[in-house]
Amino acid sequence: MPEGPEIRRAADNLEAAIKGKPLTDVWFAFAQLKPYESQLTGQIITRIETRGKALLTHFSNGLTLYSHNQLYGVWRVIDTGEIPQTTRILRVRLQTADKTILLYSASDIEMLTAEQLTTHPFLQRVGPDVLDARLTPEEVKARLLSPRFRNRQFSGLLLDQAFLAGLGNYLRVEILWQVGLTGQHKAKDLNEAQLNALSHALLDIPRLSYTTRGQADENKHHGALFRFKVFHRDGEACERCGGIIEKTTLSSRPFYWCPHCQK
């Protein structure tokens, strides 16, 4: 499943294609959304927001389209009039004069009013988004030490969207490698230096992945600015200590780590 950085980059691409342009045609696959087709035609998309792995597409008439890709959903941008070659099932089409955005295969799609946004079950449950620039390491540290989360093992906590939205498995293993901790630790057992390091890494690594993954700087990094240190690298040497990276299963997900330098 895509994690927060990938969802945010997808939202950026959608915004770049149609934000601020009048919608010339709107189509929904689900019957409960059909009444909104005429209501949205002629409106503009004012912004596309991410809440972890959910997208909120805000329209100028005050409505918001909530969508969660889950495992199979995917958004695409095409030129208006183009017919995509795909076997995926179309769920949403939002069209402007020159660009069209399409949502395929997703099933978790709703139209919300401003009031419903404040009471939506997923949005109520989800924690602060790691890509929200307003979120600080100090706030993350306070959240780690809160009664709700301080006694949770990191193996499960870092996958829980109620803790911090946008984290997922590759971010979980990369963050824990960065701070030299295993997944069995709990916040209540860390010293001050470890807490501070983890609080920063929980924001720094997702934000680095969002801003630089896939980009290259051959002069400085000899490759991608964001590179996996342990994810999918079992059997390889750890670049920090030379130990061999191992793979196991924690919280029902593949977990990659270096037993030599992660304690």
Curated annotation (Swiss-Prot):
Residue positions annotated to bind DNA are Q70, R125, N169
Q: Which gene encodes it?
A: nei
Pfam families found in the cross-reference section:
Fapy_DNA_glyco, H2TH, zf-FPG_IleRS
What's its EC?
3.2.2.-, 4.2.99.18
Q: What functional role does this protein have?
A: Involved in base excision repair of DNA damaged by oxidation or by mutagenic agents. Acts as a DNA glycosylase that recognizes and removes damaged bases. Has a preference for oxidized pyrimidines, such as thymine glycol, 5,6-dihydrouracil and 5,6-dihydrothymine. Has AP (apurinic/apyrimidinic) lyase activity and introduces nicks in the DNA strand. Cleaves the DNA backbone by beta-delta elimination to generate a single-strand break at the site of the removed base with both 3'- and 5'-phosphates.
What is the UniProt remark on how the cofactor binds and its stoichiometry? Answer: Binds 1 zinc ion per subunit.
State the reactions this protein catalyses.
2'-deoxyribonucleotide-(2'-deoxyribose 5'-phosphate)-2'-deoxyribonucleotide-DNA = a 3'-end 2'-deoxyribonucleotide-(2,3-dehydro-2,3-deoxyribose 5'-phosphate)-DNA + a 5'-end 5'-phospho-2'-deoxyribonucleoside-DNA + H(+)
Q: Where are the zinc fingers (FPG-type)?
A: 229-263
Source taxon at top rank: Bacteria
| NCBIfam families recorded | PRK10445.1 (NF007763)
Q: Spell out the family assignment given in the record's similarity comment.
A: Belongs to the FPG family.
Q: What is this protein called?
A: Endonuclease 8
Residues of the active site are P2 (schiff-base intermediate with dna), E3 (proton donor), K53 (proton donor), R253 (proton donor)
